[in-house]
Amino acid sequence: MSVREKMLEILEGIDIRFQEPLHSYSYTKVGGEADYLVFPRNRFELARVVKFANQENIPWMVLGNASNIIVRDGGIRGFVILCDKLNNVSVDGYTIEAEAGANLIETTRIALRHSLTGFEFACGIPGSVGGAVFMNAGAYGGEIAHILQSCKVLTKDGEIETLSAKDLAFGYRHSAIQESGAVVLSVKFALAPGTHQVIKQEMDRLTHLRELKQPLEYPSCGSVFKRPVGHFAGQLISEAGLKGYRIGGVEVSEKHAGFMINVADGTAKDYEDLIQSVIEKVKEHSGITLEREVRILGESK
């Protein structure tokens, strides 16, 4: 029995797509094929896929909403698991529990509807709840670490564990999940009671700032670089004269130099080449070495 036949038998009922192009699932609109793209409907299907992959020695990875990643043009070998169907969100008092595939922006709107404050900073951050925990996503002075109460994960060995914020060892755009290989299943956020109008005004203000400053009208991977201590990446790139700098179909945004946008059928290689070139030119200009925030996954073509 071939691996494919065994997969279809053991994982019967689970949505699996073979040699599926990933560009249509990525905010950058680039990326090659996944060998097996899987859409589990719940944590039990997810656990079945992980167990099968481990037994068959097939590599696997989970993607959130693919908002802060670049998938290389050669694609990704093994299983790519998209958890967007694991998207239930519930409210209990001042606590919101969200599954990993829940949309982060929509989760902040649920907090607003229940007049819960603390989540406003994330009202414009694209991506999933699971991805936000993985990266300790943040903006405008807030970050996931500030509001996370606990996190349920599936370990790489297939066990379910509940972790505290301390267990996750949050840092700037970092969590312990990045090293552990665990998969976020669900998250509990501890919020506080607030006034609906005040929360909405703050969310509207932050949304306006984002629309004003960021090139939301183009495909992009979000913030490309981490913020250097004492500096802003976008400012350093701008001061190096790189706004509008382009390689292939990808260019440094004129609107915000911290973003690289796909303006003309760019490729993942265009992104990688532009990122490396910007790092080198900023280093030459300011002496500061930018560190990449965006994750680059898969194989080159």
Swiss-Prot record:
Annotated GO MF terms: FAD binding; UDP-N-acetylmuramate dehydrogenase activity
InterPro entries in alphabetical order: FAD-bd_PCMH, FAD-bd_PCMH-like_sf, FAD-bd_PCMH_sub1, FAD-bd_PCMH_sub2, MurB, MurB_C, MurB_C_sf, Oxid_FAD_bind_N
Record keyword Nucleotide-binding present: no
Keyword Cell cycle: yes
Subcellular localization: Cytoplasm
Recorded superkingdom: Bacteria
Gene3D superfamilies found in the cross-reference section: 3.30.465.10, UDP-N-acetylenolpyruvoylglucosamine reductase, C-terminal domain (3.90.78.10), Uridine Diphospho-n-acetylenolpyruvylglucosamine Reductase, domain 2 (3.30.43.10)
An annotated GO BP: cell wall organization
E.C. designation(s): 1.3.1.98
Domain FAD-binding PCMH-type, residue spans: 30-194
Keyword terms: Cell cycle, Cell division, Cell shape, Cell wall biogenesis/degradation, Cytoplasm, FAD, Flavoprotein, NADP, Oxidoreductase, Peptidoglycan synthesis
Swiss-Prot/TrEMBL catalytic activity: UDP-N-acetyl-alpha-D-muramate + NADP(+) = UDP-N-acetyl-3-O-(1-carboxyvinyl)-alpha-D-glucosamine + NADPH + H(+)
Pathway field: Cell wall biogenesis; peptidoglycan biosynthesis
Chief site of localization: cytoplasm
Function text: Cell wall formation.
Annotated NCBIfam families: murB, PRK13905.1
HAMAP family: MurB
Name of the protein in question: UDP-N-acetylenolpyruvoylglucosamine reductase
Protein's organism: Streptococcus pneumoniae (strain 70585)
Gene of this entry: murB
